[in-house]
Amino acid sequence: TDNGTDRSLSYPFGDETRNGMKAWAIDAGTHAPLLVSCPGTIPEGTQSDDLVDFSDFLPTIADIAGAEMPDVKLDGRSFWPQCQGKEGDPRKWIYQYYYPKFTEAGQPHGEGINGNEIAWAQNQNFKLYRDGTMYAVSDRGEKSPIVKNGAGERGETARAMLQKAIDSMPVWAAKLAYGD
């Protein structure tokens, strides 16, 4: 998504006007609609709220083309069935990593414009940062963190799943010198 629309721009979204939040890790900086068109194959008006990750594009394009995938482990999965209005194999979570610049940020996440590694996993309802801070996805501005054991059974189950996802990813501790 190139981390959102420029901050100087506003745009209509449903019944509200939203501001661009480029370089923020909140929903307005990372959430982008995916539009797919294939007249005669994709039923008009088909919509899906399934999560799609960039790694899903290779298997999806291969699926559309009927190409054989190499016998290698891929992180992505085809979302072509969902495009056709079928159930498919939707993701349970997505992982995002963002390291925008080479200086330290003033905040651990949210405003990442000045640097700072920001990593999180999210599902349809919850978003968990690597530092353990959790938000409801519906809290688009991330104003109300959910304390540990404060999300109810469904939320704490999601927290455990999302933490496992984060733990499965590498930690990028080495920083590059600017200009290298």
Regions found by a protein language model. Give the residues of each.
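Active-site neighborhood of phospho(di)ester-bond hydrolases with catalytic His/Asp-centered motifs
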Residues: T1
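C-terminal cap/loop subdomain of S1 sulfatases and analogous C-terminal strand-loop tails that border
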Residues: T5-G20, W24-A25, I42-T46, D50, ...
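Ligand-binding/active-site lining segments
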Residues: A28
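Surface-exposed loop/edge segments in extracytoplasmic proteins
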Residues: G141-V147
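Short amphipathic alpha-helical coiled-coil/interface segments
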Residues: A158-I166
